Amino acid sequence: MIAAQAKLVYQLNKYYSERCQARKGAIAKTIREVCKVVSDVLKEVEVQEPRFISSLTEIDARFEGLEVVAPTEFEVVLYLNQMGVFNFVDDGSLPGCAVLKLSDGRKRSMSLWVEFITASGYLSARKIRSRFQTLVAQAVDKCSYRDVVKMIADTSEVKLRIRERYIVQITPAFKCTGIWPRSAAQWPLPHIPWPGPNRVAEVKAEGFNLLSKECYSLTGKQSSAESDAWVVHFAEAENRLLLGGCRGKCLSVLKTLRDRHLELPGQPLNNYHMKTLLLYECEKHPRETDWDEACLGDRLNGILLQLISCLQCRRCPHYFLPNLDLFQGKPHSALESAAKQTWRLAREILTNPKSLDKL
């Protein structure tokens, strides 16, 4: 048993150093190329409208606010200033979303975003995005990369196609530090020892972001007043929780397997599903010793089995917001074929670790 475990860990480490590192290297190169173009577009936006200041900065070889959705798909979060005159209201009526309401006694004119405040006093995510979309469309025509960048039409999101190969979504957002959403109040679960109190305090101080983008739970209802809502987003908090042990390596292997074998019609699975299931696995195995290098095979196997279970039940709850189902709106047939394909993959890895050489 121990010999089989060791063999799997050896093969996974080999897979990590060959396949995963190659994937990371290729993505890092793409990011540099993409960020040059996006920075140029955002510089042009800022000239037209100084309230939209580019926050895409490189820190320690990483771009702040950039997320890899897939090897050719990225999201850049553009942090906006001056949320101060608004209250964060999160009553659970829109899973995964919240609204920003003008604080009592505050005048609209005190806000930097006065023309985007609705009659009821809400700062409209949709109106800000619509204005930003117009500015980006103009910037694309003027910027020095105009020959290689195009706006993607037929969406309320701000999406660029670069060199006909890459897609970048630019999302206006507010950073909320020092507060924690009521809809995530159940976290951490009282009977689970992971993460410890110090890490919990760090994560809650890190806070979350509010993004102006279409919400999972609102698909199909975007024309209603609810589309003024903002999407609650925990990327920094999640990244902080996944520090230490073999968690990062495990996520890297999962993403690489997904990119190579689970990119299926109907797009049932993305890398965020993998990250979410890794967080649940951390709760199931709360001791740091459970995340030693020697346990990499067990943890990966546990996550793949949990993924199959979620796909079969057609439900994948968000880690911090369990009322939000990350499979909502996905075609049932796509989830079914993903379950079968994940099962084939898990069985292959478990029964024949050497198959990783070909995966």
Swiss-Prot record:
> Which InterPro entries did the record assign?
Mab-21-like_nuc_Trfase, Mab-21_HhH/H2TH-like, MAB21L/cGLR
| One term under GO cellular component | cytoplasm
Q: Which UniProt keywords apply?
A: Cytoplasm, Developmental protein, Nucleus
Keyword Transport: yes or no?
A: no
Q: Which residues cross the membrane?
A: none
Gene Ontology terms: biological process: eye development
The listed locations are: Nucleus; Cytoplasm
Where does the UniProt annotation place the signal sequence? none
**What family does the entry list?**
Belongs to the mab-21 family.
* Cross-referenced PANTHER family: CELL FATE DETERMINING PROTEIN MAB21-RELATED (PTHR10656), PROTEIN MAB-21-LIKE 2 (PTHR10656:SF37)
Function text:
Required for several aspects of embryonic development including normal development of the eye.
Its protein name is Protein mab-21-like 2-B
Organism listed in the record: Xenopus laevis
Q: What is the lineage of its organism?
A: Eukaryota, Metazoa, Chordata, Craniata, Vertebrata
